[in-house]
Amino acid sequence: MIVPTYGDVLDASNRIKEYVNKTPVLTSRMLNDRLGAQIYFKGENFQRVGAFKFRGAMNAVSKLSDEKRSKGVIAFSSGNHAQAIALSAKLLNVPATIVMPEDAPALKVAATAGYGAHIIRYNRYTEDREQIGRQLAAEHGFALIPPYDHPDVIAGQGTSAKELLEEVGQLDALFVPLGGGGLLSGSALAARSLSPGCKIFGVEPEAGNDGQQSFRSGSIVHINTPKTIADGAQTQHLGEYTFAIIRENVDDILTVSDQELVKCMHFLAERMKVVVEPTACLGFAGALLKKEELVGKKVGIILSGGNVDMKRYATLISGKEDGPTI
């Protein structure tokens, strides 16, 4: 297994730059004053398809040979990777098949179909999406592009942190949402090269703490599909590639509750006029857990995406759940 390096992130950046948005870096004076720190949000909710996933998908599809492109690609995803592969394939005239769970957010399903992909549904609690995807790939000769455990996907995801660090300079800490580990591992490659002294934290839902268990035990831990509002982090385990990078480059894995995610969503909407999906707030909520240690520090937080059904969003942020004090 050849693990990707920062050199692969650089190559990915050059390969996809004509397709991706250079997403904005957002700040809040009020938040900085309250925390006594400089906080920089990387707004991947403003990326094409509304999430960082487009970076890795575009890099992976772009690297396919003409022969593989002609046969088509297949991916399995709860939503953002599905849209990312569908759009990447459309831009490069590659047929795409996407395996999506029956309970995937309607917004994400509709967007994926809108990009022209063929969608196959499955039950995420009783069926194995990876097995379905690999079987279809073998039967039809599709190129399988998994949502996180793929060198080209990891390299593409790392371009977000690369942009952040190039814009704001070296950081003392970086907080990154964690599902399967594609964004965290890619971000770690970038941060270790561009900001060697930066502490890197992955943040996942309490209900899905397989990453934390894996990090502390030294081997990949598998769990049942977690029930959490962070649908983009409903993964059962880290990948072989992502875990190898995380184990060597990440300082710690934190967990946060759904209530903490809601509080962060509410703050971003009310104070910064930014709409994000629950998964995007994992890094923000994790930073708040460490706020006493961040006083006087320069901190990066990646907001991973903004694909959330508006009715669901309104229900979540209008609730009375208590979260961390911001």
Curated annotation (Swiss-Prot):
Enumerate the SUPFAM superfamilies for this protein.
Answer: Tryptophan synthase beta subunit-like PLP-dependent enzymes (SSF53686)
Please state the span of the N-terminal signal peptide per the UniProt entry.
Answer: none
Reactions catalysed, semicolon-separated, are: (3S)-3-hydroxy-L-aspartate = oxaloacetate + NH4(+)
How many cofactor units bind, and how? Requires a divalent metal cation such as Mn(2+), Mg(2+), or Ca(2+).
Residues that the record marks as modified (N6-(pyridoxal phosphate)lysine) are: 53
Q: Which family does it belong to?
A: Belongs to the serine/threonine dehydratase family.
What PANTHER family does the record point to?
SERINE / THREONINE RACEMASE FAMILY MEMBER, SERINE RACEMASE
The protein's name is: L-threo-3-hydroxyaspartate ammonia-lyase
